[in-house]
């Protein structure tokens, strides 16, 4: 015997199912459920009078030793690069072990193998919540330790970059130079509930100092113009990267002193490289570094200060740039340097290139013109602006923006994971990946995650007054949870290093407690591997007007006057 209930009642109880649509925050972006992996009539739900009770949705015979889940997230709406689906998510030992239908196979039909709910299983109610992978920020200036708190509170669970604190070099460049500095930053990483990896300084025309840093634990090498991004440096750094299977990251020569963009492309010589702020406002060959996004071996990213193009973007950038790159308003050449980087034409084109899937990654450039807590917000603001200005993508329809949503979520999850050699352990909601996950109320999607899981344990969450009688009284704001403390922190977060550093026992020598994981497959990849962000049109820049064309089409758009996901959500 079956009972039919109204769709509205079903959604209220169990969350949206196939055909239901959900608005993302206060944007114009609508996603639609493509598939439901749960079984109608056999849904599991926790609570008084609900189904996750002994002998019902919870198996009385399932022990942890014989495979019961440690944690199940019930009836969540997963938004990931591979799909928009409704499912239960099963977690054991901090890793995702199942995406499907969880429950008690003794009495329920369709329980996915390995997704048995037992007495050992904790429950997070995912009904009417959106589940995404934790964000990855691959361009972090480690200027202050507090940025880790702001990142995880925003839904970012992995930070890659360089720095040693507010040193002048770190304020400008994402490099942790030398074995001693790397060792100290690897040790400092023990205290933060996020995955961390550090870039060595890649500016050396001879390889010895570069090898030294990789073997000391660097997970990548960063070339920055403030240290000299010459063709000799580029070639040397890429040779070492190929030798050790790590990524090279580059901020090219804005002043075109040692090379023009054509010379940099020639020095790269078809080898894989991750180009930072590829539009150029953050730095790089003026005015045409954006051309490099045409190259199939280039993994192009943006930083969030130019995401998206608004009426405030140009004015804000000049002062930020002067501070970040140790420039003086009293030196005319410094002012000219700054002004050469800020071009409304290329920033406008950057919006469209993201929407086309030409630019593949969005990161922060934290405290060095970018904001570490706004990677996710700025990504979805860009998607919204492009929906409003360009309409549905060819792959979408008037009903939903599913393809656009999947393309944009990939920009801060799977694409940086692939680019940096992390995708074997993080970057998506897939079986076998570390359970770094974010749960969002749709009205707060991309702005304030309800719960952030690190390695399967709640590390941050919206929480009310700790002295209240229930968890919900004001003030409600993101607070560190038990996954952010003690040995639980080191057991649920990773440290990314080179395979050479692992082989040399560097984590053990430094007394590192958290698990160190080697980056891999950084060199045999190209833009074609960056999910849903693979386009390589021919890009041209007019040297007089700075107009940008892709395959002959002029790329231009108006700056936004207002944006969603902004003042409506924040008091300050």
Swiss-Prot record:
The pathway to which it is assigned is: Nitrogen metabolism; urea degradation; CO(2) and NH(3) from urea (urease route): step 1/1
Residues of the active site are 325
- Residues binding substrate are 224
Which terms does the record give in the GO molecular function aspect?
nickel cation binding; urease activity
Q: Which reaction does it catalyse?
A: urea + 2 H2O + H(+) = hydrogencarbonate + 2 NH4(+)
Q: Which InterPro entries match?
A: Amidohydro-rel, Metal-dep_hydrolase_composite, Metal_Hydrolase, Urease_alpha_N_dom, Urease_alpha_subunit, Urease_AS, Urease_asu, Urease_asu_c
- Please give an example of a GO cellular component term from this record: cytoplasm
Q: What is its EC number?
A: 3.5.1.5
Tell me where it resides. Answer: Cytoplasm
The broad enzyme category this protein falls into is hydrolase
Q: How is the cofactor bound?
A: Binds 2 nickel ions per subunit.
A Pfam family this chain is assigned to = Urease_alpha
The post-translation modification note in this UniProt entry reads: Carboxylation allows a single lysine to coordinate two nickel ions.
Sites where the protein binds Ni(2+) 2: 222, 251, 277
Q: Which residues bind Ni(2+) 1?
A: 139, 141, 222, 365
User: Urease domain: which residues?
Assistant: 134-572
GO BP term, example:
urea catabolic process
UniProt keyword terms in alphabetical order = Cytoplasm, Hydrolase, Metal-binding, Nickel
Location of N6-carboxylysine modifications = 222
CDD domains tied to this protein: Urease_alpha
What family does this belong to?
Belongs to the metallo-dependent hydrolases superfamily. Urease alpha subunit family.
What's the subunit arrangement here?
Heterotrimer of UreA (gamma), UreB (beta) and UreC (alpha) subunits. Three heterotrimers associate to form the active enzyme.
This chain belongs to the protein called: Urease subunit alpha
> Which lineage?
Bacteria, Bacillati, Cyanobacteriota, Cyanophyceae, Synechococcales
């Amino acid at each position: 015997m079956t009972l039919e209930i109204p769709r509205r009642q079903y959604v209220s109880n169990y969350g949206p199912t196939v055909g239901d649509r959900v608005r993302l925050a206060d944007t114009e972006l609508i996603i639609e459920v493509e598939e439901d992996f749960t079984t109608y009539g056999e849904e599991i739900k926790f609570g008084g009078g609900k189904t996750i009770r002994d002998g019902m949705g919870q198996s009385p015979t399932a022990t942890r030793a014989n495979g019961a889940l440690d944690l199940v997230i019930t009836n969540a709406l997963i938004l990931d690069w591979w799909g928009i689906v409704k499912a239960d998510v099963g977690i054991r030992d901090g890793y995702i072990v199942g995406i499907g239908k969880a429950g008690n196979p003794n009495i329920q039909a369709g329980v996915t193998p390995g997704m048995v709910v037992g007495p050992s299983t904790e429950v997070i109610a995912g009904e009417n919540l959106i589940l995404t992978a934790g964000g990855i920020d691959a361009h972090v200036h480690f200027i202050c330790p507090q940025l880790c708190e702001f990142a995880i509170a925003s839904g970012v669970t992995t930070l890659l970059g360089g720095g040693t604190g507010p040193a002048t070099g770190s304020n400008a460049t994402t490099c942790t130079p030398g074995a001693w500095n790397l060792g100290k930053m690897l040790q400092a990483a023990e205290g933060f509930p996020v995955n961390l990896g550090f870039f060595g300084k890649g500016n050396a025309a001879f390889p010895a100092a570069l090898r030294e840093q990789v073997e000391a634990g660097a997970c990548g090498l960063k070339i920055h113009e403030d240290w000299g991004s010459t063709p000799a440096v580029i070639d040397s750094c890429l040779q070492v990267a190929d030798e050790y299977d790590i990524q090279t990251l580059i901020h090219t020569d804005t002043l075109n002193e040692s090379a023009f963009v054509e010379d940099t492309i020639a020095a790269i010589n078809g080898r894989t490289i991750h180009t930072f702020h590829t539009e150029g406002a953050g730095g790089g060959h003026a005015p045409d570094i954006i051309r490099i996004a045409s190259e199939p071996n280039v993994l192009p990213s943006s930083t969030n200060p130019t995401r998206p193009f608004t009426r405030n973007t140009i004015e804000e950038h000049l002062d930020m740039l002067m501070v970040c790159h140790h420039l003086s308003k009293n030196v005319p050449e410094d002012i000219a340097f700054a002004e050469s980087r800020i071009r409304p034409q290329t920033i406008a084109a950057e919006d469209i290139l993201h929407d086309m899937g030409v630019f593949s990654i969005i990161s922060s450039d934290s405290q060095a013109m970018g904001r570490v807590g706004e990677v996710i917000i700025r990504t979805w603001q860009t998607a919204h602006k492009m929906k409003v200005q360009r309409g549905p993508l060819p792959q979408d329809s008037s009903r939903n923006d599913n393809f656009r949503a999947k393309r944009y979520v990939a920009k801060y999850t799977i694409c940086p994971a692939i680019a940096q050699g992390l995708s074997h352990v993080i970057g998506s909601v897939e079986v076998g990946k570390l359970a770094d996950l974010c749960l969002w109320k749709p009205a707060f999607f991309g702005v304030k995650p309800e719960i952030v899981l690190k390695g399967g344990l709640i590390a941050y969450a919206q929480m009310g007054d700790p002295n209240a009688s229930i968890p919900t009284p004001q003030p409600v704001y993101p607070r560190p949870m038990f996954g952010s403390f003690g040995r639980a922190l080191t057991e649920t977060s990773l440290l990314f290093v080179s395979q050479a550093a692992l082989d040399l026992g560097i984590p053990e020598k430094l007394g590192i407690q958290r698990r160190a994981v080697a980056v891999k497959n950084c060199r045999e990849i190209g833009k074609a591997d960056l999910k849903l962000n693979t386009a390589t049109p021919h890009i041209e820049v007019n040297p007089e007007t700075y107009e940008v064309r892709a395959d002959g089409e002029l790329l231009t758009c108006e700056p936004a006057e207002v944006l969603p996901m902004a003042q409506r959500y924040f008091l300050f």
